[in-house]
């Protein structure tokens, strides 16, 4: 019979039931580097969240500050527009990292939400040459049901590409967990990992 202690869903960092896979080793090798984008893709229940949690732990062990955004937990009211979700993103960064610069100090509707969030990250986090930040986006699939999805992932892609133009952006690592079906929106950036194949 099944062991009642076996866990379902995300497996805790200290769980004796977590089975380490090849993808864990790949993550452990990527995360300490600067300016990496890691895409963890696969259907539900293959260990994406567990792998993301371990990636976050590796980032912390390497002196990076981390922000974990689980899109399942975000209130529906923040998904009314691209501005809504990106402003929420900015407020979470400010709260979790206790930044002295606040979103209201930088946000400019005349520039639009993507540029405002980008400027906020630069001024609040990346201006500090000592700060390295890993942002984890779990269950990013939720974005795909909204009309602003292209704008959201264009913003992520712009941050990825910005590293070639502005060295500050090499202090930002991105880790994105998503299912295989909508991957076209974020294909061709970063290192793609599939826990189901590990």
Language-model regions: role of each:
Residues 1-45, 50-59, 119-127:
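Walker A/P-loop-proximal flanking segment of P-loop NTPase domains
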Residues 50-55, 84-92, 151-159, 196:
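Alpha-helical scaffold elements adjacent to nucleotide-binding pockets in ATP/GTP-utilizing enzyme cores
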Residues 60-78, 135:
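Conserved catalytic segments around the Walker B and adjacent sensor/switch elements
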Residues 66, 79-102:
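Conserved NTP-binding/hydrolysis module of P-loop NTPases
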Residues 106, 124-152, 159:
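Conserved P-loop NTPase "ATPase switch" module shared by AAA+ and STAND
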Residues 115-127, 155, 176:
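Conserved helicase/translocase P-loop NTPase motor core
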Residues 142-198:
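The catalytic "switch" region of P-loop NTPases
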């Amino acid at each position: 019979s099944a062991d009642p202690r076996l866990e379902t869903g995300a497996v805790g960092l200290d769980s004796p039931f977590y089975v380490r896979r090849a993808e864990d080793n790949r993550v452990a090798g990527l995360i300490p580097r600067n300016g990496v984008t890691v895409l963890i893709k696969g259907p539900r229940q293959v260990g994406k969240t567990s792998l993301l949690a371990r990636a976050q732990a590796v980032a912390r062990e390497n002196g990076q500050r981390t922000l974990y955004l689980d899109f399942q937990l975000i209130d529906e009211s923040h998904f009314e527009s691209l501005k809504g979700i990106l402003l929420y993103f900015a407020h979470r960064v400010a709260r979790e990292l206790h930044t002295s610069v606040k979103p209201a100090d930088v946000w400019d509707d005349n520039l639009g939400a993507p540029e405002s969030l980008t400027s906020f990250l630069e001024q609040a986090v990346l201006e500090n040459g000592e700060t390295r930040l890993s942002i984890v986006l779990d269950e990013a699939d939720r974005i795909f049901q909204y009309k602003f999805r292209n704008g959201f992932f264009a913003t992520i892609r712009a941050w990825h590409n910005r590293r070639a133009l502005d060295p500050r952006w090499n202090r930002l690592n991105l880790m994105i967990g998503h299912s295989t079906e909508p991957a076209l929106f974020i294909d061709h950036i970063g290192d793609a990992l599939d826990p189901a194949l590990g």
